[in-house]
Amino acid sequence: LGDVYKRQLYYHERYADAVRVFEAFLDGGRGWIENNIEACRHLSWCRYAMKEPREGLSALLRTLEYDTPRAEVCCDVGKHFLDRARYREAIFWYELALSRERDDRSGAFVSPDCYGYLPCIQLCVCHDRLGERARAAEYNDRAGKYKPDDPSYLRNKLYFAAQGS
């Protein structure tokens, strides 16, 4: 089945059908690396929507069968841990996202925010939740360099100013 059809099942919230189609595609072993990685991400989103977080995380980790992790996958895994208040694990994945090189010529599905803004703003949240205010403020400042008008960055800036950070 075509890539568009697989994604349409997801976008139309037909998650169980989408899971079957994505798994069949991946199990077929004939996909191009970037399509396989993106299929794993969509599979994970279906699993999370179906309230199956362990399977969602497994689908993300399955991307490692195809290549080194893309920043997009690192951010997805970071979110898995952030959503569960496992901040140290989330920090690991968001820092890894920042270390990944963006390659717009690879044919990969590139989400530019995953190579700068998103990991920085999420690292700000993680460090703040751990009580590491100075470190959180540093990451917020870094996020602001990517998106100086972003409402989250601006709210955090006021928050840290009020705290004296």
Which residues fall in each region the model found?
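Short, small-residue-biased leader/transition segments that mark boundaries at the very start
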Residues: 1-5
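TPR-repeat structural position
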Residues: 15-16, 53, 87, 133
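Start-of-helix register in tetratricopeptide repeats
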Residues: 34-38, 72, 113, 118, ...
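"A position-specific structural signal for the A-helix of alpha-solenoid helical repeats
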Residues: 42, 76-79, 122, 156
